[in-house]
Regions:
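Active-site neighborhood of phospho(di)ester-bond hydrolases with catalytic His/Asp-centered motifs
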Residues: 6-7, 32-37, 59-64, 135, ...
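Acidic, His/Gly-rich catalytic cores of divalent-metal-dependent hydrolytic chemistry
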Residues: 167, 179-251
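N-terminal active-site segment of His-dependent metallophosphoesterases
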Residues: 1-55, 240
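Beta-strand-turn-beta hairpins that frame and shape the catalytic cleft
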Residues: 1-4, 124-133, 181-185, 214-215
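Active-site neighborhood of divalent metal-dependent phosphoester bond hydrolases
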Residues: 49, 55-122, 150-159, 163-164
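Active-site-proximal segments of metal-dependent phosphoesterases and phosphodiesterases across multiple
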Residues: 82-83, 130-163, 195
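Active-site environment of divalent metal-dependent phosphoester hydrolases
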Residues: 10-15, 40-43, 65-70, 140, ...
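Anionic-ligand binding region
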Residues: 150-187
């Protein structure tokens, strides 16, 4: 079996198209496992959802931003924090406007209910007997600190305690990592969109498994970041300035 595993598309159909073309160029896959954050924040949430609808053999779980959009929750900074720290007001307004805009776009294509019902995690057993867990941030949560390169091993082990899996794949922090933490093989996929750091390519993995073993191939795909910025500006996205920072490698 061959599986493409993606996370953190964030409403970026340009990046998603590049990834899907790369998957096809690698010979295609049998399954798609998607680990959340599909629509916010980015210029084309409806386009992303339309493309995902066309994929065969898909498994979806939720990310924190999917929950924010579906249930009118919001990321940091919250209102009380802004009242105590007025310098955060611009960020607060920018993010809240962006999530409200995204909810409107998702509602317009009748996908809000779908988004609200996504499960927290996906568990399966690979053909070689490996117990797999896919979750957006960390076992038991779609939010929080997540997993980043350079984390203390004890902190990672604490988040993985009692996960009941041999192989755990996550996204959320937009930073790739591959670590053996005790008995658990931990993979952070990075992100399809809104890259953090200097490597602006879209990132995902292809998992190949049979009855004897499995392999994991990280994939890194170029796409046109300026085209994304132009798309944000053309539609007047309320979070255009914030999202463009990712596209320029400023986050």
């Amino acid at each position: 079996m061959r599986v493409a595993i993606l996370s953190d598309i964030h409403g970026n159909s340009i990046a998603l198209d590049a990834v899907l073309a790369d998957i096809e160029a690698q010979g295609g896959v049998d399954y798609f496992w998607l680990l959340g954050d599909y629509v916010a924040l980015g210029p084309d949430p409806a386009g992303v959802l339309a493309r995902l609808d066309q994929l065969p053999n898909t498994t979806f779980i939720r990310g924190n931003t999917d929950r924010y959009v579906a249930h009118d929750e919001r990321p940091f900074p919250l209102k009380d924090t802004v009242l105590a720290n007025p310098e955060l007001l611009d960020r607060y307004v920018n993010l809240n406007s962006g999530f409200a805009w995204t909810k409107g776009a998702v509602t317009a294509v009748n996908k809000l209910n779908w988004l609200s019902q996504l499960p927290l995690e996906y568990r399966t057993t690979l053909p070689d007997g490996t117990c797999f867990l896919g979750v957006h941030a960390a076992p038991g949560t779609d939010d929080g600190f997540g997993f980043k390169p350079g984390m203390d091993i004890a902190q990672m082990a604490d988040q993985l305690a009692d996960c009941s899996a041999d192989l755990v794949m996550v996204g959320h922090t937009h930073q790739c990592m591959d670590e053996q933490v005790g008995d658990v093989h931990l993979i952070n996929l990075g992100s399809v969109s809104n890259p953090v750091g200097s490597d602006l390519r879209a990132k995902y993995v292809i998992l190949t498994a049979d009855e004897t073993s499995h392999t994991i191939e990280p994939r890194f795909v170029d796409y046109d970041h300026q085209a994304v910025i132009s798309q944000l500006e053309t539609i007047g996205h309320p979070s255009a300035a914030f999202i463009s920072q990712f596209m320029r490698g400023e986050m």
